[in-house]
Amino acid sequence: MSSPRERGKSLMESSGSEPPVTPSRYESQKRRDWNTFGQYLKNQRPPVPMSHCSCNHVLDFLRYLDQFGKTKVHVPGCMFYGQPEPPAPCTCPLRQAWGSLDALIGRLRAAYEENGGPPETNPFASGAIRVYLREVRECQAKARGIPYKKKKKKKPTPEMGGGREDSSSSSSSFSFS
């Protein structure tokens, strides 16, 4: 049996004689999402090549996916609007949950660049997509009576050395500026 390090190494240095490594669940889902989005673009009239894809196509795709959603989102006129656990069924629509859409966009954003798309033109990284996701999150939180609370980032305390256990490590000199 090989160690995790050796298995990871075989991913990077795979020869033709070794069996292919099974992709992770995330990688499989990312590939499936990428193929689904590509098929969606091909089914447009006229078909849209990936090189001409814009954030508007992505927004249309997200709206298209709503029809397959499983999350009840009460409309403002519904008597259960704002109730986390309504006592009876209603006719409000089922939608894609915000968390599912957010995760989908994250995977498609990564897949776009992995498939040769330049980061500067990544339609999944557009501000319009972030605004749409924020609106969906807020709308669903109000409709279900569950306030969304953003998790606060922990600030490193000065006495702990900025949150690093070993400030002499080589990674401490690298920064994204």
Curated annotation (Swiss-Prot):
Subcellular compartments: Nucleus
Single biological process term from Gene Ontology: mRNA transcription
Biased composition (Low complexity): 168-177
Source taxon at top rank: Eukaryota
Location of the motif Nuclear localization signal: 150-154
UniProt keyword annotations, A-Z: Developmental protein, DNA-binding, Nucleus, Transcription, Transcription regulation
Positions of the ALOG domain: 25-152
UniProt similarity note: Belongs to the plant homeotic and developmental regulators ALOG protein family.
Annotated protein name in UniProt: Protein LIGHT-DEPENDENT SHORT HYPOCOTYLS 10
Lineage: Eukaryota, Viridiplantae, Streptophyta, Embryophyta, Tracheophyta
